[in-house]
Amino acid sequence: MNEDQFPKAYDPKSSETGVYSFWERSGIFVANASSEKPAYSIVMPPPNVTGILHMGHALVNTLQDTLIRYKRMQGFEVCWVPGTDHAGIATQTVVERHLKASLGKQRTDFSREEFLKHVWDWKEKSQNVILSQLRQLGCSCDWSRQRFTMDPGANRAVKKAFKILFDKGVIYRGYYLVNWDPILQTALADDEVEYEERDGWLYYIRYQVVNSEEFITVATTRPETLLGDTAIAVSPEDLRYSHLIGAKVVVPFVNREIPIIGDFSVDASFGTGAVKITPAHDKDDYKTGMNHQLPMINILTPTGEINENGGIFTGLSREVARENIITSLEALGLFVKKEAYSSRVGVSYRSGAIIEPYLSKQWFVSVDSFRDSLRGFVNSEEIRIFPPEFVRNYLTWVNNLKDWCISRQLWWGHRIPVWHNKHDENVICFDGEGGPEEVMRDPESWYQDPDVLDTWFSSGLWPLTCFGWPDENSLDLKKFYPTAVLVTGHDILFFWVTRMVLMCSAMVDTEPFSDVFLHGLIFGKSYREYDEKGEWFYVSGERKRDYDKGKALPKNVVAKWEKLSKSKGNVIDPIEMIEAYGADAVRLTLCSCANRGEQIDLDYHLFEEYKNFINKLWNGARFIFGHISELTSRDLEEGVNQDLLGLEDFYILDRFNELLDLIDGHYNCYSFDKIASLAYDFFKNDLCSTYLEIIKPTLFGKQDSDQQRATKRKLLATLLINILGVLHPIVPYITETLFQKLKATLGTVENGKGDSVTGHAVSMLRSEACMVAEYPKPIHVAFPQGLRESFGIAERLVYTIRNIRGEMQLDPREPLQAFVISSEKKELVDVCIPIMCALGGVKTVEQLAEAPKDSIFSLGVVEGIQVGVILPPEHLAKERVRLEKEKTRLEKSIDSVSKLLASEDFRTRANPSLVQAKKDSLRNSQRELQSILDKLASL
């Protein structure tokens, strides 16, 4: 074979760019909204324009591309819309840091327009990198439909959706206790807050009862908020305090008189049984305050400092104010004690700041009217969630859903399309271009709301905006909406998935997708090194890479699987992996790990393993090419003579058909790991390690006729074409490269059909590319009765020979001489002998009536067939030991099955087929044992 035509080694770098350019030039990725084919559409979860792709992006886009390529080959009109997300808080934060580092300036040093220009510049650069990386990964997106969550179409959709909900009264504005990030100075939705268990203190503080010498003591984790206290609450059933309900106490430092109230929400066993109520700075207190119509006093500025309501503590940070208040309380004799206490603390998922419950005027979406439909879509299976165990999580979250705070105090994002009158409370919601007519007439009297919408508001409309909504005449919308499936991580089931269902169904009264597949989160291996004091730090750099490659860990270093994080040193860059291993190896690794919603443990060994498989695929194909290079597609068109097919040929065709059936089922339930495993095993084990090894003597002219050799070559070409089709959705680059080589080698037949064996392969060769070839279908032949049982016996005979070779410590390269004794299954043995020779490393196999008397041999029994291997004289003792071990094993098995069959309970209750199977097993074991005993006697 010419080295230039088919290099010995596969080099991903030299082929991937060219293959992708070929796909793009051919226009294969572009969907046709006017096509009569059934539609299959996916909208890409848009990566944030904050930086570059991470391994999570590589995973989710590999899975989507696998589905898209599979459905494209099945004849669907596929449309995969790529896009990027403006990611309000995240992107603004990144750009602010960039400007601080590069120019030494804060956001507030710029006008809003100037700052946004910097953000748009950042977005362009980041987006270009992201889209380039998606191409490297092999994503077959329709780039002509590329979207951005703040492009003009998205902006129209967002304004339209806001106005629809505003006009229905679903969107409202009001004061509410929100999650406030004092660093980013914006409100966050409940699910944007992460909770951490932190050690702190429980402070005990005394309040003096008005007109009394009595004091009431409360326990609190936040003494600084006493400046905003508006009540003390006790349980009405707590006899210690029942006489004080209705009395008043004085709040220290601000001298405010507040009531002692009875409320059944108070836990009398916590602290002293009395709690301070600060409605403006605690969510539970807010509810109590609403129930008792208490004043709500905000004591903090947006930056987290004490405001003018804090008296002498005005201007202090929360932390400093806490210390000063405790000191001052001690001086007044009002501080009792503090106790160590652990509590859950809310933390901003973006800035890491401790969240402050903060009374603020914000925009909200009322969710009560959507709750039934959100449940209904899933309960009726109009939306199917995979894996199904997440259905319960979804429904629990919907049942506990609270009004959604959608306003953010940012500059980057969709500006809220509402104008406020400067002189009264009038507002105008406007979804057109420019501004409302009233504003145009009198611009000095109006101002647009300065806030922007939560990123998830625009992301919630993503499936609609990608296909042209609110233009209801959009061909894309009619053809491709709703989409087929949403593929995403289970961590944003509530962030995004539920909001898409809410927003899209509110606009068009239809679910946005039929299925949701939630993959697991990627974990990487990190290494913690402990010092003598028991303190630890993360190992990084060369040492970590050495450990990743298998270097033994010292006693003070512990490996742990953790979520990917730069600080932990366990981040794996997908682009670095593509450069090192090739895109196909990366994709196959990710698919093989993509379990259903569980933790995904990813390390370098997996990339190495699947790179080796890619090389195996190349080398296996290269071997096959060497034996089919003289064939043409016309030879395939002629078909094969099925009378010349052997047991091994029927076996590989049966295995291939079974592979297709299993893979189709796994695609339907998104079991990507099983799809990858099945395809991997078929090519590596069934095709290469088994079938190719069996037929090598025929291919090399050492056995069988020329006609049989020609038949096997046609079958090899057919199998290679088909398995490339099966593998293509997962490993598209190498399969396309090999497919094009097949087309160049075999040529194409314009109208040829082939037969039931070769026909589909001939059809595939007529395709321009592997990615648009029709997906493989079962190959129909007249399979012999008992095929699987017969080949199974052949495999067990091979295993027995290999086992004897291993136990006798025979040289693996030494050809063996074997014999078979079977009066009942002579024809089956004749068929099995070539397989035994090829896979068992046996030079000759003779069928005998009885064991040779003048030879030393080792014997095994399979289904009543005795198989023996001739041994050198020095192996006599080893054979006796082996037979004794086999005798012990069989005696234990016979004893166990005999006891089971002696049980009347088993015989009467068990399935009759199971009882019969046990009887057959017992007979076979007894026969094998007798053979072993005879052999031992002869020794």
From Swiss-Prot:
It comes from the Bacteria. GO terms for cellular component: cytosol. The keyword Iron does not apply. Its EC number is 6.1.1.9. Keywords: Aminoacyl-tRNA synthetase, ATP-binding, Coiled coil, Cytoplasm, Ligase, Nucleotide-binding, Protein biosynthesis. It catalyses: tRNA(Val) + L-valine + ATP = L-valyl-tRNA(Val) + AMP + diphosphate. A motif ('KMSKS' region) lies at residues 563-567. Residues 874-939 form a coiled coil. Pfam families: Anticodon_1, tRNA-synt_1, Val_tRNA-synt_C. PROSITE patterns: AA_TRNA_LIGASE_I. ValRS has two distinct active sites: one for aminoacylation and one for editing. The misactivated threonine is translocated from the active site to the editing site. The C-terminal coiled-coil domain is crucial for aminoacylation activity. Belongs to the class-I aminoacyl-tRNA synthetase family. ValS type 1 subfamily. Monomer. This is Valine--tRNA ligase. The gene is valS.
